[in-house]
A protein has these predicted regions:
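A residue-level signal for beta-strand positions that form part of recognition/binding surfaces
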Residues: 12-15, 31, 61, 95
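Gly/Ser/Thr-rich helix-start
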Residues: 23-24, 36, 118, 123
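Short, His- and charge-rich active-site/binding loops that engage polyanionic ligands
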Residues: 30-43
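Conserved nucleotide-ligand handling architecture
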Residues: 1-17, 21-22, 27, 55, ...
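Phosphate-centric recognition/catalysis
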Residues: 42-124
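Short, glycine/acidic-enriched capping/hinge loops at junctions between secondary-structure elements
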Residues: 27-32, 74-76
Length: 127
């Protein structure tokens, strides 16, 4: 079962800081690996991504091909392999995410304007 960390500052916005629990990946990638660029079995990654998507009640989940940059991409439809370290959308039902290991994931929400953001804040892009 997926049980992400959430924060009251984002109440009213479907969100979560997902841990490794609740997925189907094994061995090195155990368990909730959602990284399309990993060497994990593609079918497992897709199942994990679908579990996150369902948790968020989203129609699609978009993550970037993170490059440790300051590049931000605006996403209005499901896409893959966008080279960026931050994603922004105002499309209802579209979940966006930032993957992190030793970097910081940052979630942003502007409820008044219906805009959300997800950023991968690494040493190069944060400074």
């Amino acid at each position: 079962m997926i049980e992400p960390l959430t924060h009251t500052a984002l109440d009213g916005t479907a969100h979560g800081f997902f841990t490794r629990q609740g997925g189907v990946s094994t061995d090195l990638y155990e368990s909730l690996n959602v990284g399309l660029g990993s060497d994990d079995a593609h079918s497992r990654v897709l199942e994990n991504r679908d579990r996150v998507r369902q948790y968020l009640s989203a129609t699609a989940l978009v993550t970037a091909y993170q490059t440790h940059s300051t590049v931000t991409a605006f996403v209005d439809t499901p896409k893959e392999a966008i080279k960026a370290d931050a994603l922004v959308t105002k499309t209802r039902g579209l979940a966006i995410g930032a993957l992190a290991a030793d970097c910081a994931p940052v979630l942003l929400a502007d409820a008044e304007n219906g805009i959300i953001g997800a950023a991968h804040s690494g040493w190069r892009g944060a400074f």
